[in-house]
Amino acid sequence: GGGELVALIVGEGKGGGSSPLRAYVSRTLPDYAPILVCNRAPREPKPEGGFARGSGGVITALLTMAEATGADWVACARNDAERELAAKDGAPVTVPLLQSTGRLHYATPTREQYEMYYGVIANPVLWFIQHYLWDLGNEPVIDQRIHEAWSEGYVEVNRQMAKRVVEVARAATKRPLVLVHDYQLYLVPHMVRQEIPAAVIQHFVHVPWPTPQYWKVLPKPMRDAILEGLLGCDIVGFQSSLDVRNFLLTCEENGGLQVDERERAVVAGGRVVYARHYPISIDVLRTQGLAASRGVKRQEADLAKWRPKHLIARIDRTDPAKNIVRGFIAYEKLLRYHPELRGVVQFWAFLQPSRQDVGVYSRYLRQIRQMAGRINSELGTEEWQPIRLEIAESERKAIAALKNFDVLLVNPVYDGLNLVVKEGALVNGTDGVIVLSENAGAHEELREHVLSVNPFDVEATAAAMYAGLTMGSEERHRMNEAARDVVRVNDIARWISNQVQDLRDLVAPGRAAVRPELHQPAPDTPDRRRN
């Protein structure tokens, strides 16, 4: 049990300049005990024994953050294996995390509570609101099941997570610095604040923050509780400046609160809450190391055996927000408008299955398969298939695709940030062109170095793919290099250090609850330098 987890965790997280970063964080915030709070643990027990690294860009980023801050990690036991691990020896599991002094602590809701919290409210209700995915003429239908899932699932699991955070915080010798992550845990900050008023609390929202009107899909008690939860923070972090503006508007319109747009701050309950944006990024050194690894080179050798003259690629989870079906429709139009491309181009869709226990997601994967199948049967020949559809998970294969694309299609309906586009910009070695949705958070940073598209406009998307395939080599090279430079500079270390600076500058110890200088120019925060 625990020993294996220790062995796995120690010795990871060396990338991304994490040791200098660790020194910087402890210099900047010396008097705090950091606690990272996330629905998922960084390591997950496998049914056959041993542990797997938590998958996904967010977990990778949070591992770097935990390593940089030496944070304890509070997670939710999400399945029987984790519940069993948490209950071993009659005590919650606390194991060394990374090379830091931190430990891992579980909250342990019942299977039913977890399902209501995660499988009903978080996904799809909140996810679909925050990505504008509901077909509002027909759904959602907010019935007794959803009301019960809210109170007995979402509120209850947030309460259990907050209780665990408070226990960990009270055991610490320094002032707690609570770093909460994502849409599953909106209520935690207020709950922790009630128990530990002196805590410094930040919540980082990884998904888009929609307009106040769209939040009105949720019944008022639910959306009020979400705002109240977040306003327990000192700082609420978002992926883009648009998310910050939407959040401030939501506080003003739906919450009736006093907002200072220039300072990007809300006054609530006699406290000032700041809203700031910190676009998440990737660990540049780790990603480059992976791209140069033998495993990736083996995948590239396999790719070379079947690679067409022109390779269009996409790497995504099979989530309706990723807009995969419209991407296929646009590609079909490309082939019909430009028949000379048939036989010399192939669209490689390398997709990771997502949330197949949620009906909307399993239906979406079916649609993806059907659309690819139809296009292949109508336009394909014995020698050539227009779409190569692979449903699997392999980080090495994904990186091999990103190193070799001519066009990378990243066309989400809405996306908090999108790390695939940053990985592609960093590792691509073929002067590939990125076609990027204007509704991805990453568009704010990369807009000048990509071909921007409206994700709903399949004609424009087809035209952008064609422009990418036919662009002159000098322009391709220039765009490719410029995008890479943006990612190199705005790496994961900068994401973390910008947050740390704001925690120091905006929430300095001993400052009055309401800053009298709120309406004076703010200190020189990282955000100011960026905007």
Over which residues does each language-model region extend?
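Catalytic cores of carbohydrate-active enzymes across secretory and cytosolic contexts
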Residues: G3, A7-N531
